[in-house]
Amino acid sequence: MNFETIIGLEVHVELNTNSKIFSPSSAHFGEDPNASTNVIDWSFPGVLPVMNKGVIDAGIKAALALNMSIHQHMHFDRKNYFYPDNPKAYQISQFDEPIGYNGWIDITLEDGSTKKIRIERAHLEEDAGKNTHGTDGYSYVDLNRQGVPLIEIVSEADMRSPEEAYAYLTALKEIIQYTGISDVKMEEGSMRVDANISLRPYGQEAFGTKTELKNLNSFSNVRKGLEFEVERQAKILRSGGVIRQETRRYDEASKGTILMRVKEGAADYRYFPEPDLPLFEIDDAWIEDMRAELPRFPADRRASYINALGLSAYDAGQLTATKALSDFFEQAVALGGDPKQVSNWLQGEMAQFLNAEGKTIDQIALTPENLVEMIAIITDGTISSKIAKKVFVHLAKHGGSARAYVEKAGLVQISDPAVLIPIIHQVFADNEAAVADFKSGKRNADKAFTGFLMKATKGQANPQIAQQLLAQELQKLLD
């Protein structure tokens, strides 16, 4: 029997506010254990939460970016459970009235087609702390993360393969990153994914029993974990077994999933309205203010790059990988840069430089103005493409005018025949054996002179003019 795969994803995104959702403690990553905490985070008796307005701002932006309706009469709820990293013994979250609901995004599949994935809800909540189990036999609790604001984005079970889940996460990460509400760095825990997966016979409408997967710390592991679960569940069902509703974690060492616990339901958490926070009214003006702060999103930019600028779908996809890169490209084109040439430099030398330096595009000195000027002096013959690579590295590290640097460093391309011909004659004089080979009929010997000339001019000879003059002067040797 063959089965259809049913996948839904729950994505937790940490919001990049300066302070936590209900306390003034820092929400920044990387502090010493328990350095970013106060009495609210430790749940001392009598302390009360105070709402961070910036969190609601971010929630509205996320809902709008994901094509969601917004609950304009919004409240918070208590989700009750006990765990050492949760000192209150409950989490402040949203249950029946999340900030966003009924949304969707389009994903691009491997064959280039698109598919709409519905999003059930997006709700705001506080993050829990972190438990660390030491080699000394003790467990340690770090509450720096306790109270860091989260938005949990819950998709409908619309994905039918691990590949579709991967494409959904890629598109979702792009959109959230463009809004500026999170850096969505999985390596720092600011984007975390839980996956729900079940199988059903083809033609059956009812969903099968789902399994929740955790410990999916990369998009690649999401795909691998789901692929393993498809095989595991199919094997059980084909043998006449029954799938239990349970939570499993992906184990990188074994490339499989391991049982954690029997899955709880909503009733186990005993949700009820949070009594220490008021009802929040989100009026139309607030929503429109947040809408005005949103950028053009990747899909719109890609379409523009393809249809208006004539770029390939591949180039458009690469250029919209991050908002910073896309903004840089658009600014360079607006300044008169040729779209294809700008694209080539950003995907080539820029990508290599950023990778080698471990930096992002907004951390280097090169500006769109610098790049456009550099491309212009390549086009007008002031420098060669080879020299331009050296110029690019200098500009990326130090900024400034490309033309001024080229002139100061003596990198201007030599195009004047009156300058090049004497150098060619000197090359002949310095390489008598090669000249003799050429005169004796070893015609391939002429190729060596190109290298000799470029070495003599330190790579500054104009390649086209140099080739013409070399051919001219070599012919004279035979006359």
From Swiss-Prot:
Annotated coiled-coil positions are none
NCBIfam families documented for this protein: gatB, PRK05477.1-1, PRK05477.1-2, PRK05477.1-4
GO BP, one annotated term: translation
Organism whose genome encodes this protein: Streptococcus equi subsp. equi (strain 4047)
Q: What is this protein called?
A: Aspartyl/glutamyl-tRNA(Asn/Gln) amidotransferase subunit B
Kindly list the GO molecular function terms attached to this UniProt entry: asparaginyl-tRNA synthase (glutamine-hydrolyzing) activity; ATP binding; glutaminyl-tRNA synthase (glutamine-hydrolyzing) activity
EC top class named in words: ligase
Q: Which PROSITE patterns does this UniProt record tie to the protein? A: GATB (PS01234)
Alphabetical UniProt keywords: ATP-binding, Ligase, Nucleotide-binding, Protein biosynthesis
Record keywords: Nucleotide-binding included?
yes
Q: Pfam families from the xrefs?
A: GatB_N, GatB_Yqey
Q: Which InterPro entries match?
A: Asn/Gln-tRNA_amidoTrfase_suB/E, Asn/Gln-tRNA_Trfase_suB/E_cat, Asn/Gln_amidotransferase, Asn/Gln_tRNA_amidoTrase-B-like, GatB, GatB_C_1, GatB_Yqey_C_2, Gln-tRNA_amidoTrfase_suB_CS
Task: Cite the EC number.
Answer: 6.3.5.-
Q: What does this protein do?
A: Allows the formation of correctly charged Asn-tRNA(Asn) or Gln-tRNA(Gln) through the transamidation of misacylated Asp-tRNA(Asn) or Glu-tRNA(Gln) in organisms which lack either or both of asparaginyl-tRNA or glutaminyl-tRNA synthetases. The reaction takes place in the presence of glutamine and ATP through an activated phospho-Asp-tRNA(Asn) or phospho-Glu-tRNA(Gln).
Assembly and interactions? Heterotrimer of A, B and C subunits.
Report which reactions are catalysed by this protein: L-glutamyl-tRNA(Gln) + L-glutamine + ATP + H2O = L-glutaminyl-tRNA(Gln) + L-glutamate + ADP + phosphate + H(+); L-aspartyl-tRNA(Asn) + L-glutamine + ATP + H2O = L-asparaginyl-tRNA(Asn) + L-glutamate + ADP + phosphate + 2 H(+)
Q: Which domain of life is it from?
A: Bacteria
Q: Which family does the similarity line name?
A: Belongs to the GatB/GatE family. GatB subfamily.
Recorded hits in HAMAP family, A to Z, give: GatB
